[in-house]
């Protein structure tokens, strides 16, 4: 295999796998070793890798992280109480909210992936939408809309995919289950007028906006684009006025772009 040129070698290595990303996004080299921002390829190249949207800011093979992960951690899932659960929760509470003096969250939910996390968040939103639109609810009988940002990406499972502008057109074109789905309204990031217009349209057409989904630092769809505080404040204001929930989806790109776990610690968002 190593006698092949690098592009042939790469194709041979991945021929047994389905790659659902665009061919142009596949890296044109094969890493042999990596540390920090540096990669050595199988064919002798030295690559300086500044990192993609999902890369931790610590670079490749960070010594402290790898050392901690290699230790024995006695912890099962949430059905089995563990001392490590308490240790982990205390660590989260110290980290999340460290710029504002205290953690603003009472409890945490741990999921297996970003897409599953968004699915659970949207399930919570779904419960609220049911309460709002059921008989005797404040928005009884109204059509339900969701609002998300143009070029956003929230996952490839069903509901997260339905609010992911970056890949939704392909799903609508190819998937029967996405045929006719039209209850999502997309807004250009940081377009306050556009956001207000969606809520005006909802009021005029008798719809209830169940959710505003936002990435504070955008990932796959528009890597690195950040929310303005003014746009965020307007979204919160509209949500409070209409009984809408806010979903802040900060899983990979947020850590990479800001170096912290939650928007509550981003510069300008500490309050």
Which residue ranges define each predicted feature?
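Glycine-rich loop-to-alpha-helix module at the N-terminal edge of alpha/beta enzyme cores
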Residues: 19-20, 46-135
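Active-site-adjacent loop/helix segments that line or gate small-molecule/cofactor pockets in enzymes
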Residues: 1-37, 54, 72-74
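Acidic, glycine-rich active-site loops and adjacent beta-strand->loop/helix elements
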Residues: 73, 83, 115, 150-154, ...
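PLP-dependent aspartate aminotransferase-fold enzymes
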Residues: 93-213, 230
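Residue-level recognition of short loop/turn positions
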Residues: 41-43
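Generic structural signal for well-ordered, non-membrane alpha-helical segments
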Residues: 6, 10, 32, 36, ...
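General beta-strand structural signal in soluble alpha/beta enzymes
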Residues: 47-50, 109-111, 148, 246-249, ...
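Conserved PLP-enzyme active-site core in the AAT-like
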Residues: 164, 174-175, 182-188, 192-271
């Amino acid at each position: 295999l190593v006698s092949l040129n690098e592009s042939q070698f790469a194709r041979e290595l991945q021929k047994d796998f389905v790659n659902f990303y665009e061919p142009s996004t596949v890296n044109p080299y094969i890493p042999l070793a990596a540390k920090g921002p540096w990669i050595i390829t199988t064919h002798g190249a030295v690559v300086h890798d500044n990192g993609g949207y999902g890369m931790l800011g610590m670079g490749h093979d960070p010594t402290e992280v790898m050392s901690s992960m290699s230790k024995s951690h006695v912890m099962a899932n949430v059905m089995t109480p563990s001392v490590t659960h308490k240790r982990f929760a205390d660590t989260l509470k110290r980290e999340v909210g460290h710029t504002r003096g205290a953690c603003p969250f009472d409890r945490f939910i741990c999921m297996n992936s970003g897409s599953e996390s968004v699915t659970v968040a949207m399930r919570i939103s779904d419960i609220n939408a049911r309460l709002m639109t059921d008989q005797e609810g404040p928005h009884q009988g109204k059509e339900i809309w969701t609002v998300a940002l143009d070029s956003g990406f929230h996952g490839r499972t069903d509901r997260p995919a339905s609010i992911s502008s970056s890949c939704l057109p392909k799903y609508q074109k190819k998937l029967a289950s996405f045929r006719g789905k039209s209850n999502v309204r997309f807004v250009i990031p940081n377009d306050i007028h556009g956001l207000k217009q969606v809520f005006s349209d909802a009021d005029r057409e008798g719809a209830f906006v169940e959710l505003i989904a936002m990435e504070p630092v955008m990932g796959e769809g528009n890597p690195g684009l950040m929310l303005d505080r003014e746009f965020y404040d307007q979204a919160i204001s509209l949500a409070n006025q209409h009984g809408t929930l806010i979903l802040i989806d900060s899983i990979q790109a947020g850590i990479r772009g800001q170096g912290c776990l939650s928007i509550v610690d981003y510069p300008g968002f500490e309050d």
